[in-house]
Amino acid sequence: PEDGADSVERSGDHENSPYFAHPDVYNMESTDTLTVLHNFKTMQQTSEWSCGVTAALMVLNWYGKLGDWNEESLAALRHSLDGTELESYPGTTLNQAIDIFNGVGGFDIVSTKDYPDGIWMDDIQGWLAEGKPVMICWNDFGGHWQTIIGYDTMGTENTNDDVFLVADSYDTTDQNQD
């Protein structure tokens, strides 16, 4: 790999980092406060633009539909942005993410387009409880896709201390590239 998080595979890891705890999220199991997708396999993107398709690859793998799909073959399922204000944007828009899952087939897609009043923590908790990963994206700094795979209420009624567990295909910031 020449670019993306995969190009620095684990070079910044510190097993006993004094700054980050490294729970074994892959082997975690749900509890009375934690809902987690047990044994969700993460992947690292191999280019700077491929977070969206890599998030989709992780979801395909979760559902046993990975097959021969890879970053490039999923990217080819996206509609062109030529002639739009995003013409030179290399990443994946929400509509293009929908293209990917429609192209692979066999998915019932739910997106923010289906929720004009917004998606809330209760919605995400519900989908996780049903065993469904939740792809999320934001537009800051050019945009980035991640996949929510867990949610912990921390045993309190207050949502201010709640925690999302997120599979990040560009996982280079916590000294444990998992």
Could you tell me what each predicted segment is?
Residues 1-5:
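Bacterial Sec-dependent N-terminal signal peptides
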Residues 40-46, 71:
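Glutamine-centric residue-chemistry signal
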Residues 44-61, 86-101:
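Active-site nucleophilic cysteine motif
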Residues 58-65, 151-154:
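Active-site catalytic microenvironments for nucleophilic, acid-base chemistry
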Residues 64-76:
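Short, well-structured active-site flanking segments
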